[in-house]
């Protein structure tokens, strides 16, 4: 690819388009109506990190001497100088990948959008790329797994998104340069581990060394390539796009994305923290949610496992949430004007773990009875009732919440109010205090609590 020409094309689109790379212009981009109808999405963390089956930050931590991952790697694969992270790529085969079967499972579970990881922090692209040879079409699976999933998502009428975690690659493999490993200088643009810079405080907006123009230009091109190749209607970014050095490139990308997708029904960017000024895109809370309902759209992304986003066989990582807890999260998030992006970590052979499939089947069973209280609903004047308090903010799902039969979540549609009991009453009786006599409520049916019990 001629990188300079591609940059010129990007800037030309922004110059001629409706949206320009300024916060003022980008703030005029509306959230499309179709996104307002979404409630449940499927997040897919797949990649080279699925092979060691530890967790999704294995590529970073295996290069930190003394870490559990380093010790595990040395014991099972040898020293990083002899067997580095890149040497897992041939084992990431996806030979049993059946995108149609995946999409059917997701659809039956009530999901209406899919967000696969296009590129994680490790720098391996799960799609066909002209910007790097380190991609799934040329290595590992030798197939465009993003493209294959897109075809099936469109067939099933689901919305395809994509996530990019590329910007964290600036420092993600940097610890590999602190000792004799396979990550060595000199490295250049296009090398797998490049740039492997020192990791300072990765939550600091102004941490140094600052990402260079060369790296950020490459980041911009990679993001635009995803847009041009797959036209994802949702683009999810991880947190480090909030870094001050990224902001001008983020503006250029957002303008390009909005302009390209304008004729395709619009698009949405999910972001964290203050990466965008409020009103541009949809804010996301990782492994957490709001305590109260919000007048704006938002998203909670979480995983079916507490200790990992990717496939793992480690006892302390592969701790699955109960299906009941996942449904409780869905009810809580939707009642507060949110969307739930639920993550699964496929195996490196392209199959889903038995526990993943079991959870999807349980969700499907629950949705067959209770879908009408989720999809097509909106906020009622009261969204919740009960004694159990929700801890607001990110990384708050370390333990299950002890909901009681006095806890309810409310949604509404048309003239209907839906009350979902978050735990089953021992005596089979429900006491809903928010429904006063003045509300003139007609009780048609109460079903949600019955199937919620069967999810345990």
Give the ranges of each region predicted by the language model.
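Mature catalytic domains of secreted/periplasmic carbohydrate-active enzymes
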Residues: 1-447, 456
